[in-house]
Regions:
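N-terminal small-domain helix-loop-helix segment of the aminotransferase-like
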Residues: 2-94, 101, 382
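Conserved core segment of the aminotransferase class I/II
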Residues: 48-52, 224-296, 304, 378-380
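Conserved core of the PLP fold type I
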Residues: 59-188, 205-206, 211-219, 223, ...
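PLP-dependent enzyme catalytic core of the Aspartate aminotransferase-like
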Residues: 155, 331, 335-344, 350-382
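Walker B catalytic acidic pair
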Residues: 201
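Short hydrophobic/aromatic beta-strand micro-patches
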Residues: 247, 322-324, 361-363
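Conserved glycine-rich beta-strand-loop-beta hairpin in the small C-terminal domain of fold type I
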Residues: 274, 278, 294-303, 312-325, ...
Length: 382
């Protein structure tokens, strides 16, 4: 499906639906390009299957469809050449919830946890709320791309006695899809220093042409030291259906995690929330391929219009563009909000040093991207 046809068929006006993105009081009168969800309806067959379940009218206790795991693995095998053993998969209501559960189950208070910055803000909170010790390592820019500062990471591993690394793959907000070489070098360090990796891969289906997502658990030699979190919440805009997978190949770690989940009654899966993912894995591939084309088209347009003024990071994955307005303002969020009537995500949320940066959500219509570019360019020309 071409981008125009997709947008015409699936773009939806979300105003007055209790939508955080469009109905937030702060977004009134502004073009919202902040929170990471889409302005597109999910795939028709997913909606139809859900409607059929609702029409039945009974919402008693149930379990997952018999072929749920086979359907999940068929998707993963086709798109990323990986499958996960059924016994290794656990569930949670979301990536952040999963990270917090893993930290509670497998570490102790004051244990050091490293995150690479700038990064998705809840990573910071997940360390602080669990009373662990936050350690950060700044990503470094080389030839226009941000990558890991391996020397600094190794230094922190040694000096801070780091127990866990939380990895964002693909990276939010930098849009990186880590290469096999980058990940192999990183995991060699985590292996050397006995650091557990929690790999948040919820954006892994949103990949631009010319790039290939590498699942962390595809490195078989390190799989016992890695826990992966996957979901279709970003893929098909299913955020209200709180459902994600936690893949734990290491049985000793899995047993500890199971003990924690069982102790706090967290082990059950909400089957109704799992259904949209199940239907997405079965029916959503063509829809997703079209969506990725829309995101890429929007990104190319953004670069064409604004690239001569501001620093726009290359977008390899996710539908989130990270833009530096340095030279025009000291605070990109305020500049966009007050001058351009546009609500973005403030760069300093990802790192205190990123106040001149803003994250823009491109999972919307090209018309909205054009409107945003018109407003921004008008101010940049002044």
């Amino acid at each position: 499906m071409d981008t125009k046809t997709f947008t015409k068929k699936y773009y939806v006006d979300r105003k007055n639906t209790d939508c955080i993105k469009w109905d937030d009081k702060a977004a009134k009168g502004k073009l919202p390009m902040f929170i990471a969800d889409m302005d597109f309806k999910t795939e028709d067959k997913i909606n139809a299957a859900l409607a059929s379940r609702i029409k039945h009218g009974s919402y008693g206790y149930t379990f997952l469809p018999e072929d749920y795991y086979d359907t999940l693995n068929a998707w993963n095998k086709k798109r990323n050449n990986i499958t996960y053993k059924k016994e290794a998969i656990r569930f949670s209501k979301g990536a952040v919830d999963a990270i917090i559960q893993i930290i509670h189950a497998l570490t102790k208070e004051k244990d050091a946890i490293l995150i690479t910055t700038p990064v998705y803000p809840p990573f910071f909170g997940s360390v602080k709320t669990t009373k662990r010790t936050l350690v950060t390592s700044s990503l470094i820019r080389t030839n226009g791309l941000y990558t890991f500062n391996y020397e600094d990471i190794e230094k922190k591993f040694k000096e801070k006695k780091v127990k866990v690394l939380i990895l964002c793959s693909p990276h939010n907000p930098l849009g990186r899809v880590w290469t096999k070489k980058e990940l192999d070098k990183l995991f060699a360090l985590t292996h050397k220093y006995h650091v557990l990796v929690i790999s948040d891969e919820v954006h892994s289906d949103i990949i631009m042409s010319g790039h290939k997502f590498i699942p962390s658990l595809s490195f078989k030699k390190y799989e016992n030291e890695i826990i992966t979190i996957t979901a279709l919440s970003k893929t098909f805009s299913l955020a209200i259906f709180a459902h994600c997978h936690i893949v734990i190949p290491n049985k000793k770690l899995r047993d500890k995690f199971d003990k924690y989940q069982n102790e706090y009654h967290l082990a059950s899966v909400n089957a109704f929330c799992a259904y949209p993912s199940y239907y997405g894995y079965k029916y959503g591939e063509e829809w997703l391929d079209s969506l990725n084309k829309v995101v890429e088209e929007n990104y190319c347009y953004l670069c064409l219009r604004l690239g001569k003024y501001v620093d726009i990071l290359p977008l390899e994955g996710t539908y989130l563009a990270f833009v530096d307005f340095k030279g025009y303002t000291k605070n990109a969020y305020k500049f966009l909000y007050e001058k351009c009537d546009l609500m973005a995500t403030a760069g300093e949320k990802f790192d205190a040093k990123c106040a001149t940066w803003a994250r823009l959500n491109l999972a919307t219509s090209l018309a909205n991207v054009k409107k945003a570019c018109d407003a921004i360019e008008k101010e940049l020309k002044k």
